[in-house]
Amino acid sequence: SSRTIVYKGMFLVHDLRRFYADLQDPDYESAIGMVHSRFSTNTNPSWMRAHPNRFILHNGEINTIKGNTDAMLAREESISSPIMQDDMNKILPIINTSGSDSAMLDNALEFMVMNGMDLPLAVMITIPEPWENNKNISQKKRDFYQYYATMLEPWDGPAAILFSDGDVMGAVLD
């Protein structure tokens, strides 16, 4: 993306600036910065599975990962996109199942964003707050979650997610 730069390395957070020369430039500025310094918890840790991903930083586990990825795979037979049109088969499969649970969630969000959905909306649909038994939630919000629950299963943790597309940054807990 022209709005984001992703740095990755096997070092402690305080070593990031020493490792990447552009971060040492006093004129280098950014409105948004996110750092993740943990490792895979429910998949085997490896360099390829290490954060960062394109849209999210994730701490926790996606306990529904098998069902989520199976559902996404099943949808691929009938999925269409006004943006991708006849080129849809070039980006399948949507989910790279050799990645970590975080990477697979990032794949799903990337697909939604690249097909025209705003990232905050994609996150709210994918990782909805607990709403069904929440008596303090507004009817408007309840209707929102109920509507989208018919289209996509929640990616449930326990998880804390930080997200950004370079323009906006947000965080959710499931």
Predicted features by range, described:
Residues S1-D174:
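Conserved short alpha-helical segments that host acidic/polar catalytic motifs at enzyme active sites
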